[in-house]
């Protein structure tokens, strides 16, 4: 019987390594795909490990710039903070991984793709809905969800099948990391009353270990895109990495969040997003300077919906594409420089300037240079307050009657 091909999203960890053997037992030839999203792993080792475990082919694809420009950028421009806190670190990478799975599957003539998600997380939804949107004819296999093994049973299977067991398997934490940040769950973090131990963090310093002097950075934007740090031009991926180091040193971007998952449960996770939180803060301030009031007041409504769509795995939905078009239109004049102070866990904007600034000092000032027409206020107040005045007059007459 001829074997079918399946493309597996491969991380190098125990679950996806065991999945290679498990899929082989199901009569599949496994093609492993590992993406470099900026997490800092030795992905050359991961690529070779997939082959040693039994994959017939192994891909390692550097998608850092694509992830930065096509995914993280939109999240920054939409100020996506799920439930006001979470910058969508993992949720942003899933549609890109799904896209690459589909591309390799079509290239290799595979009939299926596979992922290593469990049956109780958000990621299974994000992967599978994205894959269905891109190629509804591909079969999607979720080995970890199907085999329902305990950790002990999985380790026993790995030993029986000569699957290398990671040396850090005894770590209590489940970690996911990319350019946009780092998420951490499980272990002691499952107790929402327990303080996260310092070993749960990697990208940021504890406040007591951060410098006692602030550091200032100037972030340059062109049409909503961060392009420079302190006057030096960077690609977007490199700018994010550089800012992660700068802001992380000052403890910026630590987030402890009990969130409502798509699958109906609450989970407690710890995030580190130094660059993401700094860029979102700076970008919002530049928009405040360059957007007219109507756009400034309406855009948060769109931002909330975009955030929900991305979190819920609907990156490739028609609504998200339509809202993205609105978002892009709002960025045309978001050009300028924002000065940010990094200090003791905070990214504080202390200055902003733009050639498209709608702030007119001569209209805003209370000094002798004031050019605002104060006499116009009388007529404006009369017309603006007219509906309220008429309503009050009508009801006053009814009371008197």
Swiss-Prot record:
Its EC number is 6.3.4.5. It is an enzyme of class 6 (ligase). One of its GO terms (cellular component) is cytoplasm. It is found in: Cytoplasm. ATP binds at residues 9-17, 116. L-citrulline binds at residues 86, 122, 126, 174, 183, 259, 271. It comes from the Bacteria. PROSITE patterns: ARGININOSUCCIN_SYN_1, ARGININOSUCCIN_SYN_2. L-aspartate binds at residues 118, 122-123. GO terms for molecular function: argininosuccinate synthase activity; ATP binding. Its main location: cytoplasm. The keyword Calcium does not apply. Keywords: Amino-acid biosynthesis, Arginine biosynthesis, ATP-binding, Cytoplasm, Ligase, Nucleotide-binding. It catalyses: L-citrulline + L-aspartate + ATP = 2-(N(omega)-L-arginino)succinate + AMP + diphosphate + H(+). Pathway: Amino-acid biosynthesis; L-arginine biosynthesis; L-arginine from L-ornithine and carbamoyl phosphate: step 2/3. Homotetramer. Belongs to the argininosuccinate synthase family. Type 1 subfamily. This is Argininosuccinate synthase. It comes from Bacillus cereus (strain G9842).
């Amino acid at each position: 019987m001829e074997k079918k091909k399946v493309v597996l999203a491969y991380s190098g960890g125990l679950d996806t390594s065991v999945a290679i053997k498990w899929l082989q037992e199901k009569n599949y030839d496994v093609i492993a795909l590992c993406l470099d999203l900026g997490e800092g792993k030795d992905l050359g080792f991961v690529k070779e490990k997939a082959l040693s475990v039994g994959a017939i082919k192994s891909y390692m694809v550097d998608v850092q710039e694509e992830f930065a420009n096509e995914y993280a950028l939109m999240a920054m421009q939409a100020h996506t903070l799920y439930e006001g806190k979470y910058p969508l670190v993992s949720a942003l990478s899933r549609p890109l991984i799904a896209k690459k799975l589909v591309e390799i599957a079509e290239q290799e003539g595979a009939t299926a793709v596979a992922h290593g998600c469990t049956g109780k997380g958000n990621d299974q939804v994000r992967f599978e809905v994205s894959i269905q949107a891109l190629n509804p004819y591909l079969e999607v296999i979720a080995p970890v969800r199907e085999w329902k093994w305990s950790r002990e049973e999985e380790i026993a299977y790995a030993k029986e099948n000569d699957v290398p067991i990671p040396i850090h398997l005894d770590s209590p934490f489940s970690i996911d990391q990319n350019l946009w940040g780092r998420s951490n769950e499980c272990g002691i973090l499952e107790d929402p009353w327990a303080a996260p131990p310092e070993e749960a963090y990697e990208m940021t310093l504890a406040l007591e270990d951060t410098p006692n002097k602030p550091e200032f950075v100037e972030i340059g934007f062109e049409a909503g895109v961060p392009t420079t740090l302190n006057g030096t031009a960077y690609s977007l991926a490199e700018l994010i990495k550089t800012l992660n180091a700068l802001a992380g040193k000052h403890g910026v971007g630590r987030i402890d969040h009990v969130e409502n998952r798509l699958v109906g449960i609450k989970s407690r996770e710890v995030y580190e997003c130094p660059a993401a939180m700094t860029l979102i803060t700076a970008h919002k301030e530049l928009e405040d300077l360059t957007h007219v009031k109507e756009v400034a007041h309406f855009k948060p409504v769109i931002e909330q919906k975009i955030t929900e769509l991305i979190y819920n795995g609907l990156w490739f939905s028609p609504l998200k594409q339509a809202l993205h078009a609105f978002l892009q239109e709002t960025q045309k004049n978001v050009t300028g420089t924002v000065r940010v102070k990094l200090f003791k866990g905070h990214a504080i904007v202390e200055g902003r300037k733009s050639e498209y600034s709608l702030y007119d000092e001569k209209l805003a000032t209370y000094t002798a240079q004031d050019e605002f027409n104060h006499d116009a206020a009388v007529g404006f107040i009369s017309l603006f307050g007219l509906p309220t005045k008429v309503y009050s007059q009508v009801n006053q007459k009814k009371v008197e009657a």
